[in-house]
A protein has these predicted regions:
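C-terminal low-complexity, glycine/proline- and small-hydrophobic-enriched intrinsically disordered tails
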Residues: 846-1017
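Acidic, turn-prone loop/beta-hairpin segments
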Residues: 84, 213, 220-228, 674, ...
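N-terminal, positively charged nucleic-acid-binding surface of large information/translation enzymes
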Residues: 1-294, 333, 350-383, 415-486, ...
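Core structural elements
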Residues: 156-166, 188, 732-745, 764-774, ...
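Conserved phosphate-binding loops in nucleotide/dinucleotide-binding enzymes
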Residues: 349-352, 393, 464, 580-587, ...
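Catalytic adenosine-cofactor/nucleotide-binding cores of aminoacyl-tRNA synthetases and other
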Residues: 457-459, 672-676, 681-760, 848-852, ...
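Gly/Pro-rich turn-and-neighbor structural signature
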Residues: 20, 182-216, 225-227, 239-243, ...
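Conserved short loop/turn motifs at secondary-structure junctions
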Residues: 3-5, 55, 82-83, 150, ...
């Protein structure tokens, strides 16, 4: 068929994608292959709730481009698609939709006609404007209804994501698509859980964890679950007054001086969290500071050392308190872990609210039991006396006020007394702080203290460190079966993965070295439920026993079981246990628990281990390439390496996949920024809608625009006007390719055949040379995942070499039409990964077959590549023709001569002389045999007559002088900028390089203008 004047994506994209789906081009079982190698990519399972944004689009374009490249090269490729259930995030989104009333009809329909106290409470909230408590009540009393609401949205979102993938042109193997809550995934999760348990890596313990008050669940301490927020809070200094001394071995006279010291010198602390004082168990002070204070007080050095030793050994117990607020029995602790340079050098120890405090109290001081000041709802506990039940932030304001009122907060220097304080009863925290800032101005309180607080990434509420009974995976525990810790498995694997960019290998090692035990339990309804079963008749307290206890004690076997419901029934029947009282652990697993098993789950590790060696795991594991964003590098990538090494080390050591990493190459793709270099976000309103860009320009144009920034680890600016500019550039490029094919069609070039005895023209040999350079650059770039370089190689070849020079030469010598058609064929194939839709249309038009199923053909050109060394003079000759043309064009611009005006020139180069017709056509150059002394040197071999064409030499001299002044000014500004230490220290390498390139260009302009002026004079 004849091609239209321009490529119109609206006419083709939907039909082409439907054809790809019908052909199942992503299914490796149906692909044409020419080599035995396989290639696999795992799609990072996107969260269900996410609409397509720039980051998603970039990641999918990258994976699809890599997959198409591998298929084109004859490798059996599997791009495995998946969807993540997004535990915390989805539950938060569904709760929000319930609060907004989206499911009111369904809820009303179900509760109508049911009469009991809990349902009546639900009905009351449904009828009210404030539905904030409705999700909690549904999960408590009608969990199946909440889950029905969730699944309704899940199915809709999954369909939406597949539609978005179609717009992009994604070609994964959808016949293998896996959802992280599918049975295959659940089976692997349950299997892994039991493996951890049997290997003594799994345990349950009361420990200080990150607690999301907003989502009412535990969080891990890595990026993804938590984030940081910079905010201002009051930083308050206050004192603890001496209460008592109890000595086990010393007489009263021995401790009299110490008591006298403390009576006169109460301990001053500083904190941003005064609301936790009722959970204070101790006051830790650095020994150097404590020693210096006692010596200054006049206590003998020997006695000071003895007192410190007795306090450390607990032979001497010193208690402090804040009697007026009900804080008593706070014990003095000597600890080198206190930062002596921060605050007062003394630290209030609240083990239930701070990990450092917990470590000092439990591990160093061995202080025993402690109390919590804040509960899981973010309210103060019963141990807080009159503040019990207050919100943690409001309690902060109240306690600050009461500490000042009771005289425990020192005055600022220069103030002898404070104001009379009566009562304080504001309930709004921000308003409270404004009032306190004014009323308490004389006290040592910095109300504008700026610091970072940990927040829940999903709910954006401030995380509360709390003691909670949770499940953990111990990363530093030795595995019973493998003999290594998970950390050791991870570090071994990190050394085997190729990282792009390489510096991420060190980041991975640093993360693993500092990795803490993984809290895997979440108080959610959505997600994988723990495969833990308790027999309440024998284990009413739901004690989680170790595998060793379970295996060795028959009584314990009737108390707990690990497995799914079917396995439980079999277990009960085999052991003749009563089935009536077994209940499942209510907690859900951290979303990242299943995600970290992704390479094992998708390819079928469990089935492979059970003997199915020919499945996907045996064929495609380890994954060839893993693509990810830097934001989930620690929380996901490092864990996948750790757990994949752990599980594959359980295979027979003779197995080919024994102890294998999950992926060979790890690519950190760029973060997409807006045109000002800011990260895109909904709150800033600076995001780029990929669907709108596709509607405006085409999917191919957006793909190429994004891949033009694909350098591993680098950020890419692509937003606002810049996005339009880059998309337009590549839409124009697509049209350029389209019109090249149209031109060759009019010449019937694609009907010609290229034979081995074909002898190309001067331009043909030059084109072969340029094509070889392009091909080498293209393949090397793909090898290094620098797709921007591969695309640029094609862009420059098509636009500058093929279109600008060779096709123009065909107009005067069409000998090379067969060669040109052949190379354009190859270029269309090379463009397929970057421009799949248009390439499909062009290829179908030329060959009447599917490009998506066509293997790359580049071997035929090698016949001429082998002869290039004998034809280098021809290539050099065409290069000289190009220089002459460019010289003529440049000199016209320099001397302000119209482009269409003929300029006489001479040349001593034989190839330039022989191709005068081409030069005249393309550059309006008129070849001459003789030259005058004032002719301008345009190349090493050629001169041009421009002086005779200048009608007003004086005006041109004046204009040139002005240009020289302007260029010198620009040059001076650039030189000053590059000499600025501030600029060099703060600018990015790219910006600095751009400035140096600008300076080189200005120097070149100046040299040309000065040469011109000399000639004019």
């Amino acid at each position: 068929m004849a091609l239209e004047s321009n490529y119109n994506p609206d006419l083709f994209e939907k039909a082409i994608y439907a054809k790809w789906q019908e052909l199942q081009i992503g299914n490796p079982d149906l692909q044409n292959v020419s080599i035995s190698e396989t290639h696999s990519i795992l799609m990072p399972p996107p969260n269900l709730t996410g609409d397509l944004h720039a980051g998603h689009a970039f990641q999918h374009y990258l994976m699809d481009t890599l997959s198409r490249y591998e298929r084109m090269n004859g490798r059996r490729n599997l791009w495995f698609p998946g969807v993540d259930h997004a535990g915390l995030q989805l539950e938060g989104v569904i709760d929000g939709l319930i609060i907004k009333g989206e499911f009111d009809t369904e809820i009303n329909k179900l509760v109508d006609g049911i009469n009991n106290e809990s349902i009546e409470e639900i009905k009351t909230i449904l009828a009210s404007k404030d539905k904030s408590q409705l999700p909690l009540l549904l999960k408590q009393y009608l969990p199946s209804l909440w889950l029905d609401c969730a699944w309704t949205k899940v199915n809709m979102w999954r369909d939406n994501q597949k539609n978005q993938s179609a717009v992009l042109g994604d070609t994964p193997d959808y016949s293998r698509q896996l959802f992280t809550l599918d049975k295959k995934a659940s089976d692997m999760v349950n299997f892994a859980f039991r493996e951890y348990w049997e290997d003594s890596l799994m345990y349950k313990n009361s420990y200080l964890i990150n607690w999301s008050v907003g989502l009412q669940t535990a969080l891990s301490d890595v990026s993804g679950d938590t984030d940081f927020l910079t905010r201002k809070d009051p930083f308050i200094n206050f004192i603890y007054k001496f209460e008592s001394i109890k000595s086990i071995i010393k007489t009263n006279s021995d401790i009299h001086q110490l008591e006298d010291y403390f009576v006169n010198n109460p301990i001053e602390v500083a904190t941003v969290r005064p609301e936790t004082i009722h959970g204070d168990m101790g006051i830790a002070i650095h020994p150097e500071i404590f020693r210096a204070k006692l010596l200054d007080f006049g206590i003998d050095k020997g006695q000071v050392e003895s007192l410190i030793s007795d306090i450390v050994s607990k032979d001497l117990i010193v208690n402090f308190g804040i009697k007026e607020l009900g804080v008593v029995g706070v014990q003095l602790i000597i600890s080198e872990k206190v930062d002596k340079d921060f605050g007062t050098g003394a630290l209030k120890i609240t083990p239930a609210s701070d990990l450092t405090d917990f470590d000092i109290w439990v591990n160093d001081f061995e202080g025993g039991e402690f109390v919590s000041a804040i509960n899981k709802q973010g309210l103060l506990t019963e141990s807080c006396g009159p503040y019990s039940g207050q919100d943690r932030f409001q309690a902060r304001a109240n306690i600050i006020y009461d500490l000042c009122k009771a005289g425990y907060v020192p005055l600022k220097e220069g103030f002898a007394s404070g104001p009379t304080l009566e009562s304080f009863n504001y309930t709004d925290y921000d308003k409270s702080i404004e009032v306190l800032k004014e009323q308490l101005a004389v006290f040592q309180i910095n109300f504008d203290y700026e610091h970072n607080v940990t927040i829940c990434e999903r709910s954006k509420t401030i995380v509360e460190p709390l003691i909670s009974d949770e499940f953990f995976i111990g990363v530093a525990r030795k595995s019973v079966n493998t003999g290594l810790t998970l950390q050791e498995h991870a570090l071994e694997g990190i050394g085997e993965v190729s990282f792009y960019p390489f510096e991420y290998q060190d980041r991975a090692r640093n993360f693993i070295h500092t990795l803490k035990d993984w809290c895997i339990s979440r108080n959610l309804l959505w997600g994988h439920q723990f495969p833990v079963w308790y027999n309440l008749a024998e284990n009413p307290d739901r004690v989680f026993y170790s595998y060793q206890d379970w295996k060795s004690d028959d009584e314990v076997k009737n108390k707990i079981f690990i497995g799914d419901e079917i396995q439980l029934k079999e277990y009960i029947n085999e052991n003749n246990y009563s089935p009536s009282s077994w209940v499942q652990e209510e907690k859900r697993l951290d979303t990242w628990f299943s995600s970290s098993l992704w390479p094992l789950t998708t390819f079928g590790y469990k089935e492979y281990m059970n003997g199915n060696k020919s499945n996907d795991f045996g064929t495609f594991y380890p994954t060839s390439t893993m693509v990810t964003a830097k934001e989930i590098f620690n929380i996901w990538i490092c864990r996948m390496i750790m757990l994949s090494k752990y599980f594959t080390s359980k295979l027979e050591n003779t197995d080919n996949l024994y102890n294998k990493i999950p992926f060979k190459d790890l690519i950190i793709h760029p973060t997409i920024l807006d045109d000002q270099g800011k990260k895109m976000s909904k709150s800033l309103g600076n995001g780029m809608d990929p669907v709108k860009q596709i509607d405006k320009y085409s999917s191919d144009a957006l793909r190429m625009a994004m891949m033009s920034g694909m350098i591993p680890g680098r950020n890419m600016r692509l937003g606002g006007n810049l996005a339009d500019k880059v998309c337009e550039k590549y839409r124009n490029f697509g049209n350029k390719v389209w019109n090249i094919v149209r031109f060759l069609e009019t010449k019937e070039a694609f009907k010609t055949h290229l034979t081995n005895d074909f002898d190309p023209s001067l331009s043909g040999w030059w084109l072969i040379s340029k094509y070889k350079q392009c091909l080498d650059r293209y393949e090397k770039a793909f090898d290094n995942y620098e797709l921007s370089e591969a695309l640029e190689a094609l862009y420059q070849f098509v636009w500058n070499d093929l279109a600008a020079w060779h096709l123009e030469y065909l107009k005067v010598n069409d000998l090379d039409l067969p060669l040109t058609a052949h190379i354009v064929n190859d270029i269309i194939q090379l463009l397929t990964p970057f421009m799949p839709f248009e390439s499909e249309v062009l290829w179908d038009n030329i060959t009447v077959q599917s490009m998506a199923q066509t293997l790359r053909r580049v071997e035929d050109i090698n016949h001429w590549n082998d002869q290039m060394s004998f034809r280098s003079k021809l290539v050099d000759g065409f290069d000289e023709i190009i220089k002459t043309v460019e010289g003529l064009r440049s000199v016209k611009g320099l001397f302000n001569i119209p482009a269409g005006e003929l300029v006489n020139y001479t040349s001593t180069n034989q190839y330039v002389i022989e191709n005068a017709e081409f030069i005249k056509m393309i550059a309006k150059g008129n070849a001459q045999n003789q030259e005058a002394d004032d002719w301008y040197q345009i190349t090493l071999f050629s001169k041009a007559d421009v002086i005779s064409l200048i009608k007003d030499k004086e005006s041109e001299i004046l204009r040139t002088n002005k240009q020289i002044i302007a260029v010198k000014k620009q040059k001076h500004i650039l030189e000053s900028t590059l000499q600025s230490r501030d600029f060099i220290d703060n600018a990015t390498p790219d910006v600095i390089k751009h400035k140096y390139d600008d300076l080189d260009a200005r120097n070149n302009d100046l040299a040309l203008l000065e040469q011109k002026l000399k000639l004019l004079k």
